[in-house]
From Swiss-Prot:
InterPro entries: Cytidylate_kin, Cytidylate_kinase_dom, P-loop_NTPase. One of its GO terms (molecular function) is ATP binding. It catalyses: CMP + ATP = CDP + ADP; dCMP + ATP = dCDP + ADP. Belongs to the cytidylate kinase family. Type 1 subfamily. It comes from Carboxydothermus hydrogenoformans (strain ATCC BAA-161 / DSM 6008 / Z-2901). SUPFAM superfamilies: P-loop containing nucleoside triphosphate hydrolases. Its main location: cytoplasm. NCBIfam families: cmk (TIGR00017). PANTHER family: CYTIDYLATE KINASE, CYTIDYLATE KINASE/PANTOATE-BETA-ALANINE LIGASE. The gene is cmk. This is Cytidylate kinase. GO terms for cellular component: cytosol.
Amino acid sequence: MRIAIDGPAGAGKSTVARILAKKLSFTYLDTGAMYRAVTVLFLENNLSLEDENGIKRLLEKTDIKIIPGDEGQKILLNERDVTELIRTPQVSELVAKVSALPEVRKYLTELQRKIIAKGNVVADGRDIGTVVMPEAEVKIFLTASAEERARRRHRELLAKGYEVSYEEVFREVLKRDELDTTREISPLRKAEDAILVDTTGLKIEEVVAKLLEIIGRKNDVL
């Protein structure tokens, strides 16, 4: 079975998808982490978003691996562990623009489909149900109010030791929403056959329970 979970930043996709995959003994594919890993390369190489040839050369020698583990997945970028680095504010600020680049989306979509082809998978991102895995048996679109999503992100950053105000995070969430929904290539949108789940005010375990119920109903039909 293939389960696609899409939604805007801060909706809880990664946390919920990771828990679901563990409960179902499925592979977990965090596509957002892959885009963040590529963004690290842009920052470290001072690569311009307009440098098409430079981007192609960079991607040709880029290797991204997702290594599952009991404490969560590790992201290896050219054999280097960047699991923590990809969650920094600098990466968060640039990732939407990097994600909108056609060369980057093509490269990562192909890589994601290779992982998906291996078997039972829970994949989360912004275009899983519409582009990467449109044939998924279960499609979920997670959302929440912008205020709720900003609060979650703010708590996460504070817990990691970053000094940032809620107002800054809220503005960043709104900016990310605009970039994700208006980009020319694979914009964020709900697939026609996806089930909408609003996570505003819900605890993680409540969201997971809702999704397990949806998956169970779908499984009965298949």
